[in-house]
């Protein structure tokens, strides 16, 4: 069954030393092999693959498969598709030390014989659970299998809720019955979304359609790139709902930074909406804008953290107290967290997911938003069109109803696919980037993996785009030197503000004007190396002292959750003087910094973090959980943030393992963090490789939601 240069137990050590698997992967495989044995009689009677090697051959195969399954989870996949295993090189080594000598179908048949593995197709509902599940040719750890099944079930139930059920669930009076008041609701939608002069007869206002969808469905998934108006759309929706119902509405995002941005965006959208609706003051109740919430929180805070426990206060048996939940940056929500969130929703509640399906998937296992939107990627069989605007999927009945409500003929989007398509809407037009703006053009070309267009954009010479080529010589890397000079120029502003006793919020806002993003964490061109380079350059420029661990102006990023302090992985703060206790700087403080002797008169320094509500959380540096300096951060950690200026650093000669991490989603996410200017330090070959390689996360969620794709 297996031909290898060494026993699998020895190869596991080799693969661990070569970082093809983690120590956890190896220990998991060994533990499973020790605890669970093959039923050899069952295997012999099931298939004719037993030879003179007997049980040992089965054990070797089981050991290898367990290591592969654990590695999949380490790489954020939720399952191991057996048919994707490379039989000639299962671990994808530079030179293979192992081959599997049976077919994929035979592997599946063999795995079904182990007492550690059960299959939904074969087992009865009351059968004892097993640690590993084999489902439709995919291998799962039991808990991830349950997460996936239950998330699919929750979402399907929400999507299948009939429109006629909603008024009662919203506790609205009979005069607000949606079906009976289509004309009145349609008129309000017309006021919220007046037709623009440049809209053609065949154009669709997807913001308006999204609002109508979310108004009539318990589940609404609104996806779109940066600047497409997701927050504007949801603000108008919430205003429309508050016209007809007294609802408890909560706004959340995965991180504190994303929650703060959501709050800011909602506030700004409400101000714009009030101005836009002023001409209709005699026809619409503007006072209900007050009932549109502005304050967003994190998912952890919403669910209720229990210190030193993976569980939350709110769950299936103690649901959240709300009628509508809006989740922004949904692409960042992993499968286990989405399961916890959905299970905590009360039965009557609505859910709105906002996000960009083309961004990087969550840091942990799963790609939930991408799986939910998977059906939108299929070509419409009726129109045979591949243009993005033809990717909606509506059932026949709902298409007709939504057409009447929105005023747009949606019949071209009728599809036989499952009804979850009725809950989805993709926003197309970016209002942040003009049609000829370099950042938007580059992001679009990368997202489409259009090699020729990518090069054309770079060669056009857009003012908001800058390319820095790696030029490595014996004297160093002039490209890296140029990037470090740029970093010093940008970071100078907030560091000088810190010396001048400016307001902490203003200093943090200034710091957030620029960020260096890295594809990798380790290495000279990873977060570790770039942070060290920027620190050295700033010290040489006498902008920081860096003689102590917690120096004035040091940015820190939290690497582990501390529920007692209210700090979570990815939170970013600055080491600044605590002005509330000090009152003011000593007059000689700034000069002492410049002389490199700041400790003499320095006021007490605290780590300052902006909270979702705009307040400042101050923490003694010594109490901070695991953290790092944050002049540079990974692209993954930047999700949910925006910066005026972004510099992306790519490695010069990435290893095979690093190449797997360089994807178009990573580059696209980095580009779209920039609002005004984007710089890339890299080589053409590496940028091209990343832009043409799409992220593939193994999951069965899309199959469960879109059973016909």
Segment roles from a protein language model:
Residues 1-96:
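Intrinsically disordered, low-complexity N-terminal extensions of AAA+/P-loop NTPases
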Residues 40-56, 96, 123-124, 163-187, ...:
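Intrinsically disordered, low-complexity terminal tails and inter-domain linkers enriched
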Residues 184-219:
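Conserved pre-motif I regulatory segment
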Residues 98-171, 181-184:
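Interdomain "pre-motor" coupling segment immediately N-terminal to P-loop NTPase/helicase cores
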Residues 209-211, 215-457:
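ASCE P-loop NTPase helicase motor core
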């Amino acid at each position: 069954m297996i031909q290898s240069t060494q026993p699998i137990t020895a190869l596991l050590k080799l693969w661990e030393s070569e970082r093809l698997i983690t120590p956890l992967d190896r220990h998991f495989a060994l533990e499973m092999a020790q605890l669970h044995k093959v039923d050899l009689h069952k295997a012999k009677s099931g298939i004719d693959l037993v030879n003179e090697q007997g049980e040992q051959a089965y054990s070797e195969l089981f050991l290898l498969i367990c290591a592969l399954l654990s590695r999949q989870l380490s790489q954020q996949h939720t399952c191991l598709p057996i048919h994707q295993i490379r039989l000639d090189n299962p671990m994808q080594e530079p030179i293979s030390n192992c081959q599997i000598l049976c077919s994929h179908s035979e592997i599946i048949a063999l795995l079904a014989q182990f007492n550690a593995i059960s299959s939904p197709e074969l087992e009865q509902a009351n059968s004892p659970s097993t640690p590993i599940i084999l489902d439709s040719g995919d291998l799962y750890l039991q808990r991830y299998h349950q997460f996936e099944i239950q998330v699919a079930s929750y979402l399907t139930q929400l999507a299948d809720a009939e429109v006629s059920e909603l008024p009662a669930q919203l506790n609205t009076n009979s005069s607000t019955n949606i079906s009976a008041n289509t004309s009145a609701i349609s008129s309000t939608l017309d006021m919220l979304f007046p037709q623009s002069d440049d809209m053609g007869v065949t154009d669709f206002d997807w913001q308006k359609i999204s609002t109508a969808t979310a108004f009539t469905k318990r589940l609404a998934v609104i996806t779109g790139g940066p600047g497409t108006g997701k927050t504007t759309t949801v603000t108008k929706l919430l205003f429309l709902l508050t016209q007809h119902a007294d609802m408890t509405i909560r706004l959340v995002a995965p991180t504190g930074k994303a929650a703060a941005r959501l709050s800011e965006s909602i506030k700004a959208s409400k101000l714009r909406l009030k101005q836009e609706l002023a001409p209709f003051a005699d026809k619409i109740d503007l006072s209900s804008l007050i009932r549109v919430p502005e304050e967003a929180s994190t998912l952890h805070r919403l669910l209720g953290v229990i210190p030193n426990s993976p569980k939350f206060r709110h769950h299936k048996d103690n649901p959240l107290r709300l009628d509508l939940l809006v989740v922004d940056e949904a692409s960042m929500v992993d499968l286990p967290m989405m399961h916890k969130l959905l299970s905590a929703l009360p039965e009557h509640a609505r859910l709105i997911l906002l996000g960009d399906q083309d961004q990087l998937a969550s840091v942990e296992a799963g790609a939930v938003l991408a799986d939910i939107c998977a059906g939108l990627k299929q070509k419409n069989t009726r129109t045979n069109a591949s243009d993005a605007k033809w990717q909606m999927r509506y059932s026949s009945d709902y298409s007709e109803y939504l057409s009447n409500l929105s005023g747009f003929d949606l019949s071209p989007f009728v599809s036989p696919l499952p009804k979850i398509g009725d809950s989805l809407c993709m926003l197309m037009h970016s209002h942040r980037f003009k049609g000829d703006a370099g950042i938007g053009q580059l992001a679009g070309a990368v997202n489409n993996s259009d090699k020729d267009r990518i090069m054309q954009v770079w060669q056009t010479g857009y003012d908001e785009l800058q390319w820095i080529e790696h030029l490595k010589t014996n004297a160093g890397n002039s490209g890296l030197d140029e990037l470090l000079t740029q970093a010093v120029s940008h970071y100078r502003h907030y560091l000088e503000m810190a010396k001048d006793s400016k307001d902490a919020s203003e200093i943090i806002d200034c710091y957030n004007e620029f960020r260096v993003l890295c594809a990798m964490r380790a290495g000279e061109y990873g977060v570790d190396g770039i942070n060290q380079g920027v620190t050295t350059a700033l010290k040489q420029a006498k902008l920081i002292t860096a003689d102590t661990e917690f120096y004035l102006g040091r940015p820190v990023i939290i690497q582990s959750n501390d529920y007692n302090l209210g700090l979570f992985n990815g939170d970013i703060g600055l080491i600044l003087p605590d002005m509330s206790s000090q009152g003011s700087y000593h007059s000689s403080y700034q000069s002492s910094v410049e002389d490199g002797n700041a400790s003499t008169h320095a006021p007490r320094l605290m780590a300052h973090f902006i909270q979702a509500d705009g307040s400042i959380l101050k923490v003694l540096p010594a109490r901070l959980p695991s953290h790092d300096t944050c002049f540079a951060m990974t692209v993954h950690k930047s999700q949910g943030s925006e910066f005026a200026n972004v510099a992306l650093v790519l490695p010069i000669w990435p290893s095979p393992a690093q190449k797997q991490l360089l994807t178009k989603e990573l580059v696209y996410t980095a580009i779209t963090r920039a609002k005004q200017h984007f710089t890339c330090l890299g080589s053409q070959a590496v940028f091209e490789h990343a832009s043409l390689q799409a992220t593939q996360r193994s999951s069965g969620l899309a199959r469960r939601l879109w059973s016909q794709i």
